[in-house]
Curated annotation (Swiss-Prot):
The gene is rpsJ. This is Small ribosomal subunit protein uS10. Belongs to the universal ribosomal protein uS10 family. Pfam families: Ribosomal_S10. One of its GO terms (cellular component) is ribonucleoprotein complex. Part of the 30S ribosomal subunit. Involved in the binding of tRNA to the ribosomes. It comes from Syntrophus aciditrophicus (strain SB). GO terms for molecular function: structural constituent of ribosome; tRNA binding. NCBIfam families: PRK00596.1 (NF001861), rpsJ_bact (TIGR01049). Signal peptide: none annotated. SUPFAM superfamilies: Ribosomal protein S10. Keywords: Ribonucleoprotein, Ribosomal protein. GO terms for biological process: translation.
Length: 102
């Protein structure tokens, strides 16, 4: 698989879970002999929600919530067939979203 690159983009709400998954992917790829670029921390996406505390009156009394989505990017340069097989067998945590582009 010469001159190819696998780009893996990970998203999670919990950054500790995300970093643990990134370490598993990097360790697996290095063990099979592939070169790694990253992990690159991408900007954290913050969604803020403002809702009324009361169901009826008091518009001025509000409560604020936010959801932070942490993201990482890993490039695997010149992956071998064993690298692809090892990544397919890898079992990551349930709270991590993985997008793979070849």
């Amino acid at each position: 698989m010469k001159d190819q690159k696998i780009r893996i983009r990970l998203k999670a709400y919990d950054y500790k879970l995300l970093d643990r998954s990134v370490e598993e992917i990097v360790e697996t790829a290095r063990r099979t002999g592939a070169r790694i670029a990253g992990p690159v921390p991408l900007p954290t996406e913050i969604n803020k929600y403002c809702v009324n505390r009361s169901p009826h009156v008091d518009k001025k009394s509000r409560e604020q919530f936010e959801i932070r989505t942490h993201k990482r990017l890993i490039d695997i340069i010149e992956p071998t067939q064993s690298t692809v097989d090892a990544l397919m067998k890898l079992d990551l945590s349930a709270g991590v979203d993985v997008e793979i582009k070849a």
